Swiss-Prot record:
GO molecular function terms noted in the UniProt entry: DNA binding; nuclease activity; RNA binding; zinc ion binding
Region (Disordered): 294-320, 487-572, 586-612
Residue ranges with Basic and acidic residues bias: 586-595
Protein name: Zinc finger CCCH domain-containing protein 65
Group of enzyme by EC: hydrolase
Length: 675
């Protein structure tokens, strides 16, 4: 029957099997012996059939395997049925063993009670064997009232005889009589197998009840949700989960039985209805599990969300918060007018490239490991490689020397005039060879001259510097002579001659450069204005000497006046040279002899005082010239007439000597002041 009704509520397990069977026996004993009315379950009926057979064989003893079956089979079959007899014996032995195991747990009292109802059980067995397809209506009503598990057992018992009828039968007519015995044996075997399955099911239930209960939270939640709306029954403890555990055990047993029914593969409508009922139960269970999973997932998600709210912000949240703060700060600064200072990026200074000094000399052994740069041409690249000339250079392009030897002349060809290598020589033979006479001597002379030049070069430089200094002396002398010309213009030519003679003595081998004649300044230079007095007096003396011949008296008077004027000292120091004390020095010179001035002793003869020495020599020559002139005048008769002229000349010479001594004293003091 197909069940369109909701699944049955879970119920508790039956009472122990022994009490249940005893109640059924007492209940069945009250009915008549009509075979059509029976209220016993199919499993109980099968057990009763087995017990009646055992009670008939040995009512007061334990169950023993029946031996009459094997004996009757041997009598019927005879010699030709030995093989089938052996099969029947084995089947009967197995049956006796199984029945013995079952009968061990049955009381003798139950067996005696069963013996009273032998007729009832016989009629029931005939009903099963004769009408396998048809079942009485009373039994059908009873099956519907019973549990589903017992109904399944009955269906299995009804179907298995069909399998048992497929026993192979020999076509021999002698074996037809023996077919009835195996059928009866097989029917008994089917009944015993059904009983065994029922007993095994009960044992499994009892063992599952004894197992520890899994206190998983999901199971408790699911049971509590299914039975959550019900109130607590009387006598039931709140929170007692034993009933729920029993319900779960029943569900496992039902699923196991459904699996067995699916393996049988029968097409009965009752089985299909049972399968649909089991599928609905499974669907309900699956829905309950899904609901439990959703509730558990929600329970798991709820604490997680609360933890996230309470926990610290993540890195992304912190980054977003910082970005918002920066944007807000930038807007505030823009509103206030604050601008960021923009600085030009400073370019890094380029590193100076340091070349390897060993590589420049062509002898770096570090190679690629060298810390300094090799990106340059070594200095040895301008010299030929001697190893390449002999074709033994192993460096190739990395050689620091030049391998293009055609740029360099061949030494053998230039010096000797020939090369023993001939055309195989890598050097150039384009140069003209030297003569044999020139080559050895010329090389020696050239080398000797180079050595001497190198050795005497410092001496030459010193001599050259001295010569240059001497060449500059005439210019200095010309300046001094020009200054002296202001003092003594009459003896200008004599002084020039004397200076030329002295310079010729000093520079005997040196030809002085030609100095252009210096013009006389119209105005005395600054600082030398005191010489203007002497100049005017000297000019007057020159005029007087020119006009002395016609007017001797006037000339004498003029010369005396000039000498007196020249002997007088200036009242004050000249303008511009007030730092010199001429008065004390001039008084000393007047007290001394004019022939031997004291300043001449202090003059130095070193090369630095060439000017002073030249002036001294010029003065000496002038004095000698004047003395010689006087002597000539004394010896000459023409000049002896005019004695007055002689006296005047002597006075003039004396005055000139005094003037020269004064000039020397002035120049010496001036030179000492500079030093």
């Amino acid at each position: 029957m197909e069940s369109s009704v909701a699944p049955f509520p879970h119920r508790r397990t039956h009472l122990p099997n022994r009490n249940y069977r005893s109640l059924l026996y007492h209940f069945c004993s009250s009915f008549d012996r009509e075979p059509q009315i029976s209220l016993a379950t199919p499993a109980v009926l099968q057990e009763l059939v087995l017990r009646t057979e055992i009670a008939q064989e040995s009512p007061g003893e334990t169950c023993e395997p029946p031996e009459n079956l094997s004996i009757t089979e041997s009598k019927l079959n005879g010699v030709s049925g030995d093989s089938s007899g052996e099969k029947v014996e084995t089947i009967s032995q197995e049956k006796s063993l199984m029945l013995g195991d079952i009968c061990d747990g049955i009381d003798l009292q139950d067996a005696s009670v069963v013996s009273r109802h032998t007729d009832f059980f016989d009629s029931f067995e005939l009903m099963i064997n004769e009408t396998q397809d048809s079942v009485p209506e009373s039994c059908v009503n009873l099956f519907e009232a019973l549990d589903v598990n017992d109904y399944d057992i009955v269906q299995n018992v009804l179907e298995k005889p069909n399998i048992a009828t497929q026993v192979q039968v020999d076509p021999v007519e002698s074996e037809k009589k023996a077919e009835e015995v195996p059928k009866s044996v097989e029917s008994n075997e089917v009944i015993s197998s059904g009983v065994l399955e029922a007993c095994n099911g009960t044992v499994q239930r009892e063992m599952e009840l004894e197992k520890p209960v899994d206190n998983s939270p999901v199971l408790v939640d699911s049971v509590s949700r299914i039975v959550g709306g019900d109130d607590v029954e009387e006598g039931e403890i709140s929170g007692d989960d034993n009933d729920d555990m029993l319900v779960e055990d029943d569900e496992t047993v039902e699923r196991h039985e459904e699996y067995q029914v699916s393996q049988d593969g029968t097409g009965n409508s009752h089985l299909t209805s049972h399968k649909s009922f089991g599928v609905e139960v499974m669907n309900v269970d699956n829905q309950a599990k899904k609901i439990d999973q959703t509730f558990s997932n929600e329970a798991k998600m709820d604490p997680g969300t609360s933890i996230k709210k309470r926990s610290a912000p993540s890195k992304d949240a912190k980054a977003r918060k910082r970005a918002k703060a920066r944007i807000k700060r930038a807007q505030e600064r823009i509103a206030l007018g604050v601008k960021k200072l923009k600085l030009k990026p400073v370019a890094p200074k380029p590193k100076p490239i340091k070349y390897c000094r060993h590589y420049l000399k062509g002898r770096c052994h570090e190679g690629d490991k060298c810390k300094f740069s090799h990106d340059t041409i070594p200095e040895t690249k301008c010299s030929p490689c001697c190893y390449f000339a002999t074709q033994s250079c192993m460096k190739g392009d990395d050689c620091p020397f030049d391998h293009d030897l055609s740029k360099y002349p061949c030494n053998n060809f230039i010096t000797k005039g020939f090369c023993y290598r001939g055309d195989s020589c890598l050097f150039s033979h384009k140069g003209t060879p030297q003569s044999a006479s020139d080559t050895p001597s010329a090389n020696v002379t050239v080398s000797s001259t180079k050595i001497t030049a190198a050795s005497f070069s410092p001496q030459k430089t010193k001599k050259q510097s001295v010569r240059d200094a001497i060449a500059k002396l005439p210019a200095i002398q010309a300046r001094v002579s020009s200054s002296v010309a202001f003092l003594k213009p009459s003896s200008h030519s004599n002084q020039r001659n004397s200076s030329d003679a002295s310079s010729s003595k000093i520079n005997e081998h040196v030809t002085p450069p030609q100095v252009p004649p210096l013009r006389k300044p119209s105005v005395a230079p600054k600082g030398m204005s005191f010489l203007s007095l002497d100049k005017t007096s000297q000019e007057d003396t020159v005029k007087a000497s020119s006009a002395s011949k016609p007017n001797t008296d006037n000339s004498d008077s003029q010369t005396l006046k000039q000498s007196q004027q020249g002997s007088f000292l200036p009242l004050g120091p000249p303008k511009g040279i007030s730092f010199l004390s001429f008065a004390s020095e001039e008084q000393k010179t007047l007290n001394r002899e004019p022939q031997k001035p004291a300043s001449s002793k202090n003059l130095k003869t070193t090369p630095s005082s060439h000017i002073q020495s030249s002036l001294l020599s010029a003065m000496k020559l002038a004095a000698e010239f004047e003395s010689a002139k006087v002597e000539r005048g004394n010896n000459d008769p023409t000049e002896a007439v005019n004695k007055s002229n002689v006296t005047v000349d002597t006075a003039v010479t004396r005055n000139s000597g005094n003037i020269s001594s004064k000039i020397l004293e002035f120049l010496s003091s001036f030179s000492h002041g500079k030093n």
